[in-house]
Amino acid sequence: MPTISQLAKGCRVKKTWKSKVPALNMLYNSLHKKELKLSAPFKRGVCTRVATMTPKKPNSALRKFARVKLSNGIEVNAYIPGEGHNLQEHSIVLIRGGKVKDLPGIRYHIVRGTQDTTGVAKRSQGRSKYGAKRPKKSK
């Protein structure tokens, strides 16, 4: 509990909060050339580059990522989850928030099974995360 003299020196300061996915919190109105703060769960974009990256120290792999120019004009790096993909330059993708722990600078994931992105083939468990359809039952 603060004393009166402590409160007289200055009131309590609210903690400032910074978004972990800033590109999803901005909307661009091209008609009026204005930027608005409006958060969205997903954003559509066009791939400008598809490449691989090596993860941070204890891990070793070639992780796939894409540079995506979003519909609000911001360009971000997005991780391509799952094994194998069909993405190339000019592919239209949908991105969601969520960083990859061992890839610095990647704060977004590409949603598999939407737009030009196909789902992961032969995926039987955790299918919804990778856009895979339910396998046909064999008799």
UniProtKB/Swiss-Prot annotation:
Q: Which PANTHER family match?
A: 30S RIBOSOMAL PROTEIN S12 FAMILY MEMBER (PTHR11652)
One cellular component GO annotation, for this chain's record?
A: small ribosomal subunit
Q: Which SUPFAM superfamilies match?
A: Nucleic acid-binding proteins
Could you tell me which species this protein originates from? Mesomycoplasma hyopneumoniae (strain 7448)
Q: What is this protein called?
A: Small ribosomal subunit protein uS12
Q: Where is the composition biased (Basic residues)?
A: 124-139
Q: Which family does it belong to?
A: Belongs to the universal ribosomal protein uS12 family.
Q: Which gene encodes it?
A: rpsL
Residues with the modification 3-methylthioaspartic acid, per the entry, are D102
Region described as Disordered: 116-139
Taxon lineage: Bacteria, Bacillati, Mycoplasmatota, Mycoplasmoidales, Metamycoplasmataceae
Quote one Gene Ontology molecular function term: structural constituent of ribosome
The protein's matches in HAMAP family, at most eight in alphabetical order, are given as: Ribosomal_uS12_B (MF_00403_B)
How the protein assembles, per its UniProt entry? Part of the 30S ribosomal subunit. Contacts proteins S8 and S17. May interact with IF1 in the 30S initiation complex.
Q: Which domain of life is it from?
A: Bacteria
Which Pfam families does this UniProt record tie to the protein?
Ribosom_S12_S23
